[in-house]
Amino acid sequence: MEGFDAVHSSPICQSFAAVTDWRGSRQDYPDLLTPTLALLNSYGLPWIVENVVEAARFGPLRADHVLCGTQFGRNVRRHRAFQTGNWDFFDLVEPCRCHRNRDLVPFGHKNERAFADAMGCTWMTNLEARQAIPPAYTHWLGTALAGHLNAQEVTA
């Protein structure tokens, strides 16, 4: 990882996602999260990894932050867990205000285009948006990480 100051990773989530059982079996997908966490820890750089909340409930992910689209003014119910390594931060965001029958979900199949647009992923196809996270999540975490890196530079 020479030349990099930090790493963000989003390994595929199908081996932990409950929705996978609707279409087959989670055992049909490799667990890439566990080796990703080991690899990230070996680099010694600050890192962030994202996955479904089930990866924190039933897998190796530690949910340092759980984010929902409604926390960022998006009409989207899209919970994702994030773990940080070699740095940490505490910053409050609005509480999750998702509503089962009002907010858009990725697997409704009738409003998929609206879901992608509501996430802020207007350039993605409907199918791509099913596996994406709202850019607002990465922006929020990336801003915090940039602040951490800048503070490290100042103290060095």
Language-model region placement:
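Class I S-adenosyl-L-methionine
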Residues: 1-7, 13-155
